[in-house]
Design a protein with these regions (language model features):
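ATP-binding N-terminal substructure of ATP-dependent carboxylate-amine bond-forming enzymes
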Residues: 1-97
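Solvent-exposed alpha-helices and their adjacent loops that cap or buttress functional pockets
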Residues: 21-23, 38-39, 62, 92, ...
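Short acidic-hydrophobic, aromatic-tinged amphipathic segments that line or gate anion-handling sites
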Residues: 45-51, 123-127, 158
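A conserved helix-loop-beta module that forms one wall/lid of the active-site cleft
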Residues: 92-154
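Internal nucleotide-binding/catalytic subdomain
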Residues: 154, 158-296
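Active-site "cap" helix and flanking loop/linker of ATP-utilizing ligase/carboxylase catalytic domains
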Residues: 248-270, 288-359, 372
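Generic C-terminus detector
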Residues: 369-373, 378-426
Length: 426
């Protein structure tokens, strides 16, 4: 079979790396891919942007692609799944209407309220004055979210009223997030521990993936601004068997059934970003309509099932006939980022010390990289995700940091404490 993976991040490198291990996969293309996918002997990059739907469609038709897996949110929100399905091509992902679960924070909050799915108290605003009045009524800490897509960075957790007012002004009166910020959601600050709960959905049936925990803040000890994610590990010990069942019953099933009831049948990866409080009650912070990045990297390292087989079953509405097998060992991924990220950073720096062959119990997944002649250069803020397995989270952490040691470029940095919550539970 011919498989097409759309995207150019670490998530897509991990999905393509896992897809090509399938006995069903004859060729795996990645559009546009990165240096990591270019250097994988079994993968082929295709120079088409992830959001150029007409060109992707033409390529899929010409190459007779049997299955397309969409990595990032942007093509989903502009309707790539609708376009491929109309052309009779198998594609795993939600339709444009269903992708509103990620594409609009306001849509999601209203949906959660309609279906009594636990979430933070909130209100939507498009005007500065009512938003400021609401802030003053509620006080800080409080959370301000840009309504549209902002690459995982459109959320401000304001610890003071001044920070909150500045965020509202920046988004609604200024242009901090462009069109994405012209409508905002203000919601209560939730206390607890976060977890990423990702499932595969075929419209009716659900197959849970392994749980994981992301590290959003740029600095050690969860300090500094939010990023797209500085590292992750799987599984997340905060999600006990009991909490897992609670999430399925209170969040996942009501979401899948609620979307279907409203005429937006959901297919694809569904990622619930959760806050779990001290009583074990989960609340939805956000939905993403795709796999998380960097959570995909440790999850794919642990997945022992055939990813292509699972995606095909989902496209056929037969996920109820499938189970997923996992390496019992935890996996942990550390993101190496460009100096200055998540603010301004340079690109085009040569990366030194990348492993020349496959490493035991680990994998260096590429994100913001490109190949120029034979040099691997930086091409984004989050550049690599160095991922490893271990007998416990501490061992996986030790192995991942060992693998990062030889790798460097001008200004590169990483958090030194990925996995600390799981390790501190011991």
């Amino acid at each position: 079979m011919k498989i097409l993976v759309i995207g150019n991040g670490g998530r897509e490198h991990a999905l393509a790396w896992k897809a090509v291990q399938s006995p069903l996969a004859e060729t795996v293309f990645v559009a546009p891919g990165n240096a990591g996918t270019a250097l994988e002997p079994a993968l082929q990059n295709v120079a088409i942007s992830a959001t150029d739907v007409p060109a992707l469609l033409e390529f899929a038709r010409r190459e007779k692609i049997d299955l397309t897996i969409v990595g990032p949110e942007a093509p989903l929100v502009i309707g790539i799944v609708d376009a491929f399905r109309e052309a009779g091509l198998a594609i795993f992902g939600p339709t444009q209407a269903a992708a509103q679960l990620e594409g609009s924070k306001a849509f999601t909050k209203d949906f959660l309220a309609r279906h009594q799915i636990p979430s933070a108290e909130y209100q939507n605003f498009t005007e500065v004055e009512p938003a400021l009045a609401y802030l003053r009524e509620k006080g800080a800490p409080i959370v301000i979210k840009a309504d549209g897509l902002a690459a995982g960075k459109g959320v401000i957790v304001a610890m003071t009223l001044q920070e909150a007012e500045d965020a509202v002004q920046d988004m609604l009166a200024g242009n901090a997030f462009g069109d994405a910020g012209h409508r905002i959601v203000i919601e209560e600050f939730l206390d607890g521990e976060e977890a990423s709960f990702i499932v595969m959905v075929d419209g009716e049936h659900v197959l849970p993936m392994a749980t994981s925990q992301d590290h959003k803040r740029v600095g050690d000890g969860d300090t500094g601004p939010n990023t797209g994610g500085m590292g992750a590990y799987s599984p997340a010990p905060v999600v006990t068997d009991e909490i897992h069942q609670r999430v399925m019953d209170q969040v996942i099933w009501p979401t899948v059934r609620g979307m279907a009831a409203e005429g937006n049948v959901y297919t694809g990866f569904l990622y619930a970003g959760l806050m779990i409080d001290h009583t074990g009650q989960p609340k939805v912070i956000e939905f993403n309509c795709r796999f998380g990045d960097p959570e995909t990297q440790p999850i794919m390292l642990r997945l022992q099932s055939d990813l292509v087989d699972l995606c095909l079953a989902a496209c056929d509405g037969k996920l109820d006939q499938k189970t997923s097998q996992w390496d019992p060992r935890p996996a942990l991924g550390v993101v190496l980022a460009a100096g200055g990220y998540p603010g301004d950073y340079t690109q085009g720096d040569q990366i030194h010390g990348l492993p020349l062959e496959e490493v035991a119990d680990g994998k260096v997944f590429h994100a913001g990289t490109r190949l120029e002649e034979d040099l691997v250069l930086t091409n984004g803020g989050r550049v690599l995700c160095v991922t490893a397995l271990g007998d416990d989270v501490a061992a996986a952490q030790k192995r991942a940091y060992e693998l990062t040691k030889p790798i460097s470029w001008q200004g590169s940095f990483c958090r030194r404490d990925i996995g600390y919550r799981a390790i501190n539970r011991k």
